[in-house]
A protein has these predicted regions:
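HDAC/HDAC-like amidohydrolase catalytic core signature
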Residues: 1-162
Length: 163
């Protein structure tokens, strides 16, 4: 039987984007309800994982950008750009999301799992080195790819994005 890890955390639900925002916690709440069903939950592994370190995030993002995102923790609502709204939980959730990706890559490398799915918020594949973009605070995909290359010695990493 395949070992599929599903990464989820209540902190991802605490990232608030506003009632009418396209990127909503309801997406994960719906999936959580399904995953909590006994006949479904038994098919997956739900690993414990740590948040990404600042050093891991800094491998892909500038110090200034990280400070800008961290500063949003002082606000109940703050816009980093026209599409990217944060709340006081967003910075912590973003570090946790990047940590989920790193942990999944580490477990895949150690052959502890066959595949993984990161049910994270805020999403993380549009952010650039120096700015949030497209609902994303940090680029979890780039952070994970760099981790695989620099820490685990992978020469190439393929990224497929179909949104």
């Amino acid at each position: 039987m395949r070992r599929t890890a599903v990464y989820r955390d209540p902190l991802f639900l605490a990232h608030q984007t506003g009632r009418d925002h396209l990127e909503s916690s309801e997406r994960l709440r719906t999936l959580d309800r399904e995953l909590d069903r006994p006949e479904v939950a038994g098919q997956f592994v739900f690993p414990d994982f740590a948040s990404a370190t600042i050093a891991a995030v800094q491998a892909n993002h500038s110090r200034e950008h990280i400070r800008e995102v961290a500063a949003t923790a002082a606000h109940t609502a703050f816009y980093l750009d026209a599409d990217t709204r944060t709340s006081n939980a967003s910075y912590g959730a973003a570090l946790r999301a990047a940590g989920a990706v790193i942990d999944g890559i580490e477990r895949l490398d150690r052959d502890e799992i066959d595949n993984g799915f990161c049910l994270v918020r805020p999403p993380g594949h549009h952010a650039e080195r120096d700015q949030a973009m497209g609902f994303c605070l940090f680029n979890n995909v780039a952070i994970g790819a760099r981790w695989a290359r620099k820490r685990l010695g992978y020469e190439r990493v393929m990224i497929v994005d179909w949104d």
